[in-house]
Amino acid sequence: MSLQNIIETAFENRADITPTTVTPEVKEAVLETIRQLDSGKLRVAERLGVGEWKVNEWAKKAVLLSFRIQDNEVLNDGVNKYFDKVPTKFADWSEDEFKNAGFRAVPGAVARRGSFVAKNVVLMPSYVNIGAYVDEGAMVDTWATVGSCAQIGKNVHLSGGVGIGGVLEPLQASPTIIEDNCFIGARSEIVEGVIVEEGSVISMGVFIGQSTKIFDRTTGEIYQGRVPAGSVVVSGSMPSKDGSHSLYCAVIVKRVDAQTRAKTSVNELLRGI
């Protein structure tokens, strides 16, 4: 049986799987899947085009199964002790392994095993959860969190305190995705499988979930669940039908193409909106 088939079959019987009852075949299949996620050979979601992604549900199933086949144990990274089922990604790495991986991880940065961090990434004191994928050149700034299975594109900047939500269940749901060359402003939260399409700028303190209305003030269109490519987004509000109150929304104040985005600083894009 293929790795995927073993995982799919085991997941159907997951209620019966414990650290003591799991078969050697299933345990090795789960651990191999986690190893492939950790190395970047396998991804929870694969990009088909701008805003279009295919979810590998079986990889998410393997992550969920990994919690069932392992007991909590004391983990020690040389500085702190933890009690968990998932070791940190580079707790026992040598200097050569760090050099080969090609990213920086400053003191206080935590990534769980089963997450992938590409070359030229900088991890400030931050957290990257299992199943996540952080692509080349990304910056994960101080106290930013990358949730389980989240996909972070090339050259993305996650500013201080940003939260990128994790999505393990429902299995068919897409993870939260930040596509290439996006900027996410400080303390913003992107959650519940929202896709921020490439080249977008999210201002400081913007909160976007699946139910958040994203209003394009130029066209009058309202989006939910995705931020169109090249959008510059700030916090706003929309009046109720009777005008008695307003509710939070995100507002697309302008669109920029890749050429403009490359030549213009984030502050300039947000100035005079």
Curated annotation (Swiss-Prot):
The lineage of its organism: Bacteria, Pseudomonadati, Pseudomonadota, Betaproteobacteria, Neisseriales. Signal peptide: none annotated. Belongs to the transferase hexapeptide repeat family. It holds the Pfam family Hexapep_2. It is an enzyme of class 2 (transferase). Keywords: Acyltransferase, Amino-acid biosynthesis, Cytoplasm, Diaminopimelate biosynthesis, Lysine biosynthesis, Repeat, Transferase. Substrate binds at residues 104, 141. The gene is dapD. Its EC number is 2.3.1.117. GO terms for biological process: diaminopimelate biosynthetic process; lysine biosynthetic process via diaminopimelate. It comes from the Bacteria. This is 2,3,4,5-tetrahydropyridine-2,6-dicarboxylate N-succinyltransferase. It comes from Neisseria meningitidis serogroup A / serotype 4A (strain DSM 15465 / Z2491).
